[in-house]
Each structure stands twice: as C-alpha cells, then as structure tokens.
Regions:
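Ubiquitin-like/PB1-type beta-grasp interaction modules and other compact soluble beta-rich domains
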Residues: 1-74
Length: 75
C-alpha cells in the first residue's frame, strides 16, 4: 500500500506538488523528503496525519494521508 501526501497553500507553490503518492515512509519528515525530492522543510510548517495534527517525527504507515500546510494566520 501507499501513503498519500498533500501540500496546501504556499507550500503547494514552493514544492510544485499539490498531491502525490509515495510507496513508503517511516515518519512525516521522511514523507516530506520523498514527496519533495529532498527539498528543505520551511520553518513553521504544520503537518497532519489522517486529519490530526502531528509532529514531523510522528510515524506514518501504509494507507495514511499526510498533509503539510503553512501556519494559519489572521487578523
């Protein structure tokens, strides 16, 4: 099985990837590296695994959805 990786807002533009499928990853950081081809992670990126906030060192498994998005700001 595979892992679905999504990028939102400005991260979509920076990575050039909206959504991709990777074969495997051990952590969310590993999923970032594989989905972006090793692009450095910008500061303050948020990650969610299966719609729940997580850290970059959180484990991922086959069938998971990993989403990356910039911090939410408002005013």
């Amino acid at each position: 099985m595979s892992i679905q990786v999504k990028f939102f807002a400005s991260l979509r533009e920076k990575t050039g990837v909206a959504e991709t499928i990777i074969d495997a990853a051990h952590t969310a950081a590993d999923a970032w590296d594989k989905a972006t081809g090793g692009m450095p992670q910008p500061n303050n990126v948020l990650v969610a695994i299966n719609l729940e906030y997580a850290s970059f060192d959180a484990p991922v498994k086959a069938g998971d959805e990993v989403a990356f998005f910039p911090p939410v700001t408002g005013g």
